Amino acid sequence: MPNTKSAEKHQRKSQRKRIFNLRAKKELKEQIKQLKDLIEAKKKQEALAFFPKIQSLLDRLVKRKKLVANNANRKKRRLLEKIEKITGDGIS
């Protein structure tokens, strides 16, 4: 239990941030899983169309400082490499 009103407020704020962070992380994981499923099914066009959505989400999380920039860049690059592997051409 917080001892002061400001400590109570800080606790409420941190709980709201925690919920947002969990939702964002869950959404990211779900979208990456969807893309990986498309790649495994070798659906090239759908995977290429879906990739910008994940890219946008990663960039938003970096902008809000919920994800480290290098981590997001690494995720984007690895997903793009998997897409390139099924399409057979360099997208970069």
UniProtKB/Swiss-Prot annotation:
InterPro entries: Ribosomal_bS20, Ribosomal_bS20_sf. GO terms for biological process: translation. GO terms for molecular function: rRNA binding; structural constituent of ribosome. It holds the Pfam family Ribosomal_S20p. Keywords: Ribonucleoprotein, Ribosomal protein, RNA-binding, rRNA-binding. GO terms for cellular component: ribonucleoprotein complex; ribosome. NCBIfam families: S20. Belongs to the bacterial ribosomal protein bS20 family. Binds directly to 16S ribosomal RNA. This is Small ribosomal subunit protein bS20. The gene is rpsT.
